[in-house]
């Protein structure tokens, strides 16, 4: 098993990536290079930074990548709030995605704390 797959933080981020990709399929075409792309990139970045950090040798390097992942998750939170405000996402869908984002952020933060 790849080293990153054992972390709940990565597992939650991976689920979030898939959910964001599905949810953004229905965004307007004019948002393809805007909010659609930004939301997808932020979600993907969170998971990808955990993957990259897990491949590093030292704890400090891993913590650095976890910091980047946390920033990406915060960026995604804002993108989802904008998408809901613009009515690209139904309130229920936005709430589900935001709950997933919060869960992913929590486990990523806990993983970072465990690296002390």
Where are these regions (language model features)?
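Amphipathic alpha-helical assembly/interaction segments
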Residues: 1-116
């Amino acid at each position: 098993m790849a080293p990153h797959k054992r972390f709940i933080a990565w597992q939650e981020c991976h689920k979030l990536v898939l959910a964001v990709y599905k949810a953004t399929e229905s965004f307007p075409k004019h948002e393809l290079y805007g909010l659609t792309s930004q939301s997808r990139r932020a979600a993907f970045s969170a998971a990808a930074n955990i993957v990259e950090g897990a491949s590093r040798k030292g704890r400090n390097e891993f913590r650095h990548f976890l910091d980047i992942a946390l920033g990406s998750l915060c960026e995604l939170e804002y993108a989802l709030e904008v998408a809901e405000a613009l009515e690209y996402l139904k309130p229920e869908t936005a709430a589900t995605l935001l709950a997933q984002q919060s869960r992913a952020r929590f486990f990523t933060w806990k993983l970072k704390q465990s690296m002390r």
